[in-house]
Amino acid sequence: LDYKVGDALGVVPENPPHIVQELIDIQGWDAEQIVTTHNGEKTLYEALKKDFEVHMANKKFVQSLAEKVVSAGMKISVKLVSRTRGTSNWNAEESSPLPPELVKSKPSEDPSEKVESLCEDTKAMEDYLWTRDYVDIMREFDVKYSPEEFFELAGRVKPRLYSIASSHDAHPGFVELTVGIVRFSYHGRDRGGLATQFMADEIGNTDQQVGVFMSPTKSFVLPEDKDTDIIMVGPGTGIAPFRAFMEQRVHDGGKGKNWLFFGDQSEKTEFYYKDTIESWLDNGDLYRFTTAWSRDQAEKIYVQHRLKEHGAEIWEWFENGAYFYICGDKTYMAKDVHRALIEIAIEHGGMSEEDATHFIEKTMMKEQKRYLRDVY
């Protein structure tokens, strides 16, 4: 387990046994059937548990429903035809009227129309898939697939990368992660993140072996000069690499100052590594620690707000060659922090919008490589 700070650990998760069994049961498959996947021959149960992501459905699978719920001649639910066996061989063009017996038993929402509307609306498809797995959809549409058909549609299990939260020099032979466990209920069933649930339920609780690998970084690294100051922004589990950075900086004994920005919803419940951080502060290893608790007051406060509050000092650090690091959510947080840096350059650097953008995005990030990001 040789690694450096800034690297990530790849974790190869497995599907929850109860979801695998539900899928087998609803399709009427034989769990012990020998099948062949991209990883060789094994039982169907093992294939579903280890080779394919069955905890969440994908767009390709929903699109396949069109062939399952639509009859050969026109858009009629397979369910309806099965209820009216006398007309199961009836065929017609879309413009032809339906037989009376089919009209009577038609549900309020035609499954084929629902599939078509989902396939035509990207946002609707995303919303639909966000809260459903294959079991949900199979129950909703009452469709059957062979294992081989399902393998062609289901996505393969992909490893998840987690920023390493420890220094190898401080913890030889060990690697530590900071993981937010995702669990929730929807449509009457318990759900969660594939890898986070797997680690929470299996590691330390069973003899389960976990597949892992190192994912080295080439760019998200500490300055070669140990006396260089650094600013770290890592809200939530984004603090992970900066715990490693701090352990390494303490181990190396350089004179560079360390400033950590951290935040989450509440100080009472999400103050990760509180004792460790307080120890760094007491020992003088952490020069400054700035927090942003978004729900501990009426007004929501995030790390980008704290950055702008300390804009003058941050700009002074930049002028003195400090490195700036950010880790965490790329959709909102990273963009807001990026904008805050541009505004700091405008307000405290006396730059125009164009010059400030060039300084942050070109000079610091690309030329000097002292604005570094690990976002996801």
Where are the model-predicted features located?
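FNR-like FAD-binding dehydrogenase module
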Residues: 1-376
